[in-house]
Amino acid sequence: MTAAAILAAAVCSCAPPHGAARAPAVASAAAGPAPEAGERHFARIRQLTFGGENAEAYFSRDGKRLIFQSTREGRRCDQQYVMNVDGSGVHRVSTGSGKTTCGYFFDGDRRIFFASTHAADTACPPKPDPSRGYVWGLDPYDIYVANPDGSGLRRLTNFGVYTAEGTLSPDGHTIVFTSLKDGDLDIYTMRIDGSNLKRLTFQPGYDGGPFFSPDGTKIVYRAWHPADTALTSYRELLRQRLVRPNRMEIWVMNTDGSDQHQITNLGGANFAPYFTPDGRKIIFSSNYKNPRSRDFELYLVNPDGSGLEQVTHHAEFDGFPMFSPDGTKLVWASGRSSREGELNLFLADWQP
């Protein structure tokens, strides 16, 4: 899900990709704010982006680059960009049309995939009617693959409904993602060529944001399974391509979809779970201490739900965490050191 929705709740190519343009020059990583009291896992923080909304930054397999989504170049909705881990070499890799989300490197960092709405409409999707309260729009994303400079764009899925939130298995062979293709928001896997499609979740409600464990045997995700009148309301909104995320908790399952079980019961919105590189803990974002606020913090928890520990201690949004492949760094999106309404990317040296 996009950064804007949550808040309301480098390859150097010799030419820009077709239909794309270089982003304006930006400063490379600057010394960021000092860690807040209690942020013992952060040895040093560096700021990577400066202005706008920037989120969902994911490392390349070699740990040298990041793909992320951003509103910049005067656009009203997110496009995909790649940069070096020091914040330099920023360039757009999506078409510049429609809205994009959830980019990821694959094929030995030789290709990327991301979700985009540009085939359905080149304009930004309309925002949900505010009279409906706090809802997310389920825009008609499909998943595309491209080269890391944005060239060679090819459509991987062709479902014509919300299909996004894709990430990659450790062996590089499987994409896990969320789709509305069968009428509900469920988690699926497929091979990187789009074959061998499998549905993993079947319980009514929103199952999404999946990531594989480092050993490839588990999938961690967020879920909300309403019941009774809440389920009726959920289905009515779904028909209108909307969802109201009243509550999301963290779940874990085997990669074949078996042994689905909830590991948090905190209340509020708990999302963006990601295993630590040793597989011993899960980091995620939550506003459970004040579910009506935008003050999301990062937390660690054991895979059995025990040992909850708060990681960030800043009165702004902190979310979308991802560890570098070697486990020495954490990248995440935060409102710290930013103007109101902005969200920037930060990189911290990680202390276990």
What is each model feature region?
Residues H18-A29:
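Short, low-complexity, disordered segments immediately C-terminal to signal peptides
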Residues A29-E53, N84-K99, A146-Y162, M190-Y206, ...:
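Multi-bladed beta-propeller domains
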Residues F50-E53, S70-Q80, T95-T100, A115-D142, ...:
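A flexible loop/linker signature enriched in serine peptidases of the S9 family
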Residues R61-D62, D107-G108, P170-D171, P214-D215, ...:
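Residue-level detector of Asp-centered blade-edge/turn motifs that repeat once per structural unit
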Residues L66-I67, I112, I175, I219, ...:
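Hydrophobic beta-strand positions that form the internal "hydrophobic ladder"
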